[in-house]
Amino acid sequence: MNTPLRRVSIAVMVMVVALLANATYLQVIKADDLRSDPRNSRVLLDEYSRQRGQISAGGQVLAASISTDDRYKYLRTYPPNQLAPNSPMANAPVTGFYSMLYSSTGLERTEDQVLNGSDDRLFGRRLFDLISGRDPRGGNVVTTIDPVVQQVAYDQLFSRGYTGAVVAIEPSTGRVLAMASSPSYDPNLLASHDGAQTSEAWDQLNSDPDKPLLNRAISATYPPGSTFKVLVTAAALENGASPDDQLTAASTITLPDTETSLENYNGSTCGGGATASLREAFARSCNTAFVELGINTGADALRDTASAFGIGEETTSLPLPVADSTIGSIPDDAALGQSSIGQRDVALTPLQDAVIAATVANGGVRMAPHMVSQLQSPDLSNLSTTAPDSRGQAISAETAATLTSLMIGSENNTGGEGKIAGVQIASKTGTAEHGTDPRNTPPHAWYIGFAPAEDPKIAIAVIVEDGGDRALAATGGSVAAPVGRAVIAAGLQGR
């Protein structure tokens, strides 16, 4: 071969290699990025040419796809309940949204392969649709959510103008009955095929200082305040303490090796004597007594008990992503004293606090929380069913029974609206300081509990940020307890 021809051959070969390399790069290495690029209209057209499956709860459709006349064959919708026009907002923390421009969140994201029909378990269905010429359809997601409890949980927050969250769990199974967050948003606005409308809604939601897109039930952590005393008491009881043990009743206590003092609510003493029993200190939620109790119990026991309740453990069962809860570092007894009243670096999601209540209610057995009951094929045949998943005996049945008794005492000592006639609730309130100037910042108000105390059917956690409508005067009993009791009342209907 002469030199010019050789050069031409080499040039052609180099171009072929470059073409193959570029094709490989685009089709293999960059394939996922290109598929997920919202500007890729071919991907959008393909996704919207299939009827996406439904998300449902208690027989009610929370999300569905309807046919349209535009180039995108199906529109994702979140239909309102006839009795609750704001139900799409109530359900948004569960469903999330499915958007042409902004991807997806919630179950729309975590169960996307089932909903869009690409799940491996639906291969036979896809093949049948291809051979028969039928339009492809996605599978369905059946949730554990009780739509009545979910709506009540959201309405209790929304109607009062509260920013916060509610989680309700069935103690014996871990089924999540409600997961509400307020303020919320209408996912229909982000599912629109009108790009301008979707962009405007997105900008408004993201610029809102109240963060309506944030699922506060699982994506935010808060100091739990006195609700953490349930866990501290569990640690103490598991390590030999008794409800009759005497603790300081002083109005203030100085943390070891510091000049920092902590005080009881309103600077009051814990009863009329120099000491108070653990039972009385729990009912009155005395900070000084619990600083002493926590230090006497020890940091290792507190860490072990926190771990047994699932704190620090990744939550994969939901199946939504959940922020990590933590008790923080405890380098010395001063830190231990602060942590023992649910302050310092202790930070829990509302879901985690609900799990603590549910574990006590379930005789000390911790069940993994889950929100998907069943995955179905398009013809409603079963793909998988979520079975209750025990994560072990967090505390003994005896300790759980003692805690239940103490929580009954706390409920009976707590004011606020909404007490349910004929139903004994076991509960614990919390009023948690936060921020750089906690004494002048409205506290977060907490309420965790379960009912009926003698045969628990529902366990709940309520967080109301920044004192709700009570500002600096807020307490868990006055602000969060009425919300929690209303949710419990709804959850007990038919159970």
What are the language-model segments listed below?
Residues 176-226, 231-467, 476:
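Beta-lactam-recognizing serine transpeptidase/beta-lactamase-like catalytic domain environment
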Residues 1-197, 221-223, 300-308, 420, ...:
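Periplasmic/cell-envelope proteins involved in peptidoglycan metabolism and beta-lactam response
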